[in-house]
C-alpha cells in the first residue's frame, strides 16, 4: 500500500467538523508540546479525550473504508485535528515510527495549503493534494510529506493505524 485517495460522505464530514468545533472551545484538548504544525493548533490524541467521545463511531467508519481498500484489519494508534491559520504549514516528516498507515481528511476547502508528497530525495514532489472538503488520502506511513502554507483557514483530521498484531 503506497497511496490512495477517496471521498468521504458530506454528512460524515459535517458531523466530524461539528464535533471538533464544539470540542475546540476547551483548551485542555490541545497539546502544549512541540509539533510539526507551524502557524496553527493541534489537538492531543482525541481517542483519549472526553470531549471527542462522540467522534468514535465516525472515525470507525473511516477505519472501515481504509480496511476495505487495503484488505487488512487495522487498529487505531492516534487521531488529531489540526487547524492552520493563514500562513500555517507543516514541516517535512513521516510517521514510520508510529504506524503503518497514515490518513488526512480535509474538513474544509481552503486556498493554498496543499499536501506535498516527496520522493526519497525529500525535494521532488510525486504528488500534490489540494485541500478539498471531504477528500481523504491515506498512505504508507514512511512516505515523506508536508503541508505548504495555507492562504486561508485550513482544518484537517489526521490519524494513524496499524495491524493489531504489530
Which role does the model predict for each range below?
Residues 64-166:
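Catalytic core of non-heme Fe(II) oxygenases with the double-stranded beta-helix
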Residues 1-72:
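Non-heme Fe(II)/2-oxoglutarate
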Amino acid at each position: 500500500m503506497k497511496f490512495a485517495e477517496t471521498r468521504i460522505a458530506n454528512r460524515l464530514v459535517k458531523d466530524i467538523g461539528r464535533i471538533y468545533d464544539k470540542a475546540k472551545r476547551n483548551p485542555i484538548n490541545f497539546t502544549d508540546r512541540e509539533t510539526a504544525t507551524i502557524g496553527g493548533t493541534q489537538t492531543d490524541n482525541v481517542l483519549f479525550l472526553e470531549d471527542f467521545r462522540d467522534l468514535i463511531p465516525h472515525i470507525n467508519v473511516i477505519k472501515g473504508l481504509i480496511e476495505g481498500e487495503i484488505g487488512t484489519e487495522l487498529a487505531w494508534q492516534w487521531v488529531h485535528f489540526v487547524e492552520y491559520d493563514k500562513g500555517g504549514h507543516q514541516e517535512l516528516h513521516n510517521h514510520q515510527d508510529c504506524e503503518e498507515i497514515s490518513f488526512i481528511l480535509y474538513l474544509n476547502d481552503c486556498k493554498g495549503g496543499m499536501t506535498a508528497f516527496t520522493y526519497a530525495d525529500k525535494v521532488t514532489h510525486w504528488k500534490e493534494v489540494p485541500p478539498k472538503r471531504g477528500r481523504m488520502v491515506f498512505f504508507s506511513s514512511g512516505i515523506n510529506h508536508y503541508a505548504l502554507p495555507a492562504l486561508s483557514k485550513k482544518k484537517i483530521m489526521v490519524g494513524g493505524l496499524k495491524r493489531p498484531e504489530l
